[in-house]
Amino acid sequence: MTSLLLNAKCLVVKVGSSLVTNNGAGLDKGAIAAWADQIARLVKSGRQVVLVSSGAVAEGMQRLGWKKRPVAINELQAAAAVGQMGLVQMYESCFASHGLHTAQILLTHADLADRKRYLNARTTLRTLLDLGVIPIINENDTVVTDEIRFGDNDTLGSLVANLIEADALVILTDQPGLYSADPRKHPDAQFIQYETAGNPALEKMAGGAGTLIGSGGMLTKILAAKRAARSGAHTVIASGREPDILVRLAQGEVVGTHLKAGQVKTLARKQWLADQLRVAGKVVVDEGAAKALREGGRSLLPIGVMAVEGSFERGEVVSCVNTAGEEIARGLVNYSALETARILRQPSHEIEHILGYIDGPELIHRDNLILV
């Protein structure tokens, strides 16, 4: 067996808070220098690397003299704003010693939800990689709200992997990888070395939140791997405490949990649709429509819609759920919530008569719809 990273040319590496801080008390320069050294070796071997690094909040807490991680979002935003300066400066200094340039990229969900901004971000990142620059990515904490935040850097890392169509996502944590149960509570827990990303059994086994310093538990990592697999990216979850972990993985050594992207790669536009973490509303579909969506790859017609939930406008992303509330698909809707409520259960030829205009016979065209 060899590492899934052996032939990977473009990597997204996510480094957790505990791996770049002194137990949450500010940044650990020695640790960051070591990460820069490993990534520099990968770049000089011909690979492209995007770094998603935690640590801004912890550094901000240190600079502000806060001992306890704040709960209020405005205080977290303030800590992140202060700490981001130190985080980027330290990475810049460490990479400069290897003759490499870095670039700071701060993203929000709104950047990736808007198709034009999404494509612009992809072009910029690809250009930076072609120039041999190391993009250092984080969430733009100072402007996000609780409703539109990524929530953790595992999620952000997977979205970036999809954005640039990376070959692999590496999630480095303070744990060796994924177990069948929490090994701290269950000594007989089995270590999972190889599995397919998206296997439902993994989500059932994954635990809750991690340390007090970070924000992501194993479940977020499993979901991140599932998301990254849509663009064909394999995921490795491994301990950042292992010496030269990135270099060893790139050389083919099997360390940590390897989650293979077993599914067929999703088309770029549909992948973007699937990556939308927030939906504007829901439409409840009947059994016939649910079957047509699942099995036939059909468009969603108004006649198959039973109810509308939420307030959405034309062109926004909505979730399609069955009568049991289970999400089947999501897509870009052709009509607003108010208009949808007027035409639901109606045949498509009645749309123009009811609304006074028609923007297509489908509520959601199959080209703008993806199964989930």
From Swiss-Prot:
Reaction(s) catalysed (UniProt annotation): L-glutamate + ATP = L-glutamyl 5-phosphate + ADP
Annotated substrate binding sites: S54, D141, N153
Q: Which GO terms describe its molecular function?
A: ATP binding; glutamate 5-kinase activity; RNA binding
Coiled-coil stretches noted in the UniProt entry, renumbered to this chain: none
GO BP term (any one): L-proline biosynthetic process
Task: List positions binding ATP.
Answer: K14, T173, D174, S215, G216, G217, M218, L219, T220, K221
Keywords, comma-separated and alphabetical: Amino-acid biosynthesis, ATP-binding, Cytoplasm, Kinase, Nucleotide-binding, Proline biosynthesis, Transferase
Q: Does the keyword Cytoplasm apply?
A: yes
Q: In which pathway does it act?
A: Amino-acid biosynthesis; L-proline biosynthesis; L-glutamate 5-semialdehyde from L-glutamate: step 1/2
Q: Which Pfam families match?
A: AA_kinase, PUA
Per UniProt, residues of the PUA domain are: 280-358
Where, subcellularly, is it found?
Cytoplasm
Major location category of this protein: cytoplasm
Q: Which InterPro entries does its entry note?
A: AceGlu_kinase-like_sf, Asp/Glu/Uridylate_kinase, G5K_ProB, Glu/AcGlu_kinase, Glu_5kinase, Glu_5kinase/COase_Synthase, Glutamate_5-kinase_CS, PUA
The record's listing under SUPFAM superfamilies reads: Carbamate kinase-like, PUA domain-like
Q: Please give the GO cellular component terms listed in this UniProt entry.
A: cytosol
Q: What's its EC?
A: 2.7.2.11
Entry's family note: Belongs to the glutamate 5-kinase family.
Its annotated function is as follows: Catalyzes the transfer of a phosphate group to glutamate to form L-glutamate 5-phosphate.
Q: What is this protein called?
A: Glutamate 5-kinase
- Naturally occurring in which organism (per UniProt): Methylobacillus flagellatus (strain ATCC 51484 / DSM 6875 / VKM B-1610 / KT)
